[in-house]
Amino acid sequence: MNVMSKHALRFIVLSGSLAVTGAHADGDSARGKKLFEECAACHALERGANGVGPSLNGVFERKAGELADFRYSPAMKRSALPWNARTLDIFLADPQQEIKGNRMPFSGIPEARDRADLIEYLKAATK
């Protein structure tokens, strides 16, 4: 393979991977709503409606462990992780790895598309 062909092949591969990433970057809110059904076992979207997990109302406007009327693990409080699309994506991929010692009994969402869809739903549903 000549040098020009190698560069062309790299460009095609990179372009394809960027296109796939871009397709999931915004997420599908309707699909995210369906995915949230599993989260709803512990989390509510309404303000002050804490369950086993904290209410997610206003989650994009606060830091981890900051909701006054919920008892967080010391690890979650110490993290003070600012919640945004990027940090939620990382956390939801593997909660125990991202904040070691947190009490959330959930192994994570391995698929990037699923996380993007859930986050897109949460952006609108938690305002």
Spell out what each predicted region is.
Residues 29, 85, 111-112:
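Alpha-helix N-capping/helix-start residues
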Residues 13-19:
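Hydrophobic alpha-helical targeting segments used for export or membrane insertion
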